[in-house]
C-alpha cells in the first residue's frame, strides 16, 4: 500500500554498492518478479540487439517507462540486468521515508529521491550526473 508523507523534503543521494546491486538483481529475477505481487515469469526485450550495439559504442541511454504499474521498476531492473548495464532510478522521496532499511537498500542500488510536487533541481542535476557517468538511467 502506498503511503505518503507531509514531512519536509529531504534529498537522498545515490550510493551504489556493487554487492547490493548483485543481490538485488538476483532477488528481483528469482523471487520478486515471479512472486505473487508481479507474477512475471519471463521477460523478453524486443530490440535488444540495437541496445547492445549502442551500449558497446559507449552511448548513454535514458529509459523513460510509463510507470503504469508497481511492477515497472522491477521490470526495468531486470531489463538492465539482462543488458548488463547499471541501473539508477529516480524515486519519490516518500519511498525513502518508509524505513531506514528501505532507504539504505534503495540508495545502494543507485537510486535517488525526487520531490514530485516541486521543482527538484538537486534531483535533476543528480540525474544528469548519473547519466553522464553510468551510461543508463
Which positions does each model-derived feature cover?
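Glycine-rich anion/phosphate-binding loops
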Residues: 116-122
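Carboxylate/His-rich catalytic cores and anion/metal-binding grooves
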Residues: 77, 84-91
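Short, solvent-exposed loop/turn segments at the edges of secondary structure
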Residues: 84, 106-109, 134
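Membrane-anchoring hydrophobic helices of lipid-metabolizing enzymes
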Residues: 1-78, 98-103, 107-111, 126
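Short beta-alpha junction loops
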Residues: 92-96
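Residue-level signal for alpha-helix termini/capping positions
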Residues: 55-56, 81, 131-132
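Conserved Motif II region of HX4D acyltransferases
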Residues: 59-66, 87-89, 126-137
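A polyanion-binding, active-site-adjacent surface
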Residues: 89, 111-113
Amino acid at each position: 500500500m502506498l503511503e505518503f508523507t507531509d514531512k519536509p523534503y529531504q534529498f537522498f543521494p545515490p550510493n551504489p554498492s556493487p554487492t547490493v546491486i548483485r543481490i538485488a538483481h538476483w532477488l528481483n529475477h528469482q523471487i520478486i518478479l515471479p512472486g505473487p505481487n508481479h507474477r512475471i515469469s519471463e521477460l523478453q526485450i524486443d530490440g535488444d540487439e540495437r541496445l547492445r550495439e549502442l551500449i558497446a559504442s559507449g552511448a548513454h541511454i535514458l529509459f523513460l517507462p510509463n510507470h503504469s504499474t508497481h511492477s515497472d521498476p522491477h521490470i526495468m531492473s531486470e531489463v538492465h540486468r539482462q543488458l548488463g548495464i547499471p541501473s539508477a532510478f529516480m524515486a519519490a522521496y516518500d519511498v525513502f521515508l518508509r524505513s531506514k532499511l528501505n532507504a539504505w537498500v534503495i540508495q545502494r542500488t543507485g537510486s535517488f529521491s525526487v520531490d514530485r510536487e516541486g521543482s527538484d533541481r538537486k534531483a535533476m542535476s543528480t540525474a544528469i550526473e548519473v547519466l553522464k557517468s553510468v551510461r543508463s538511467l
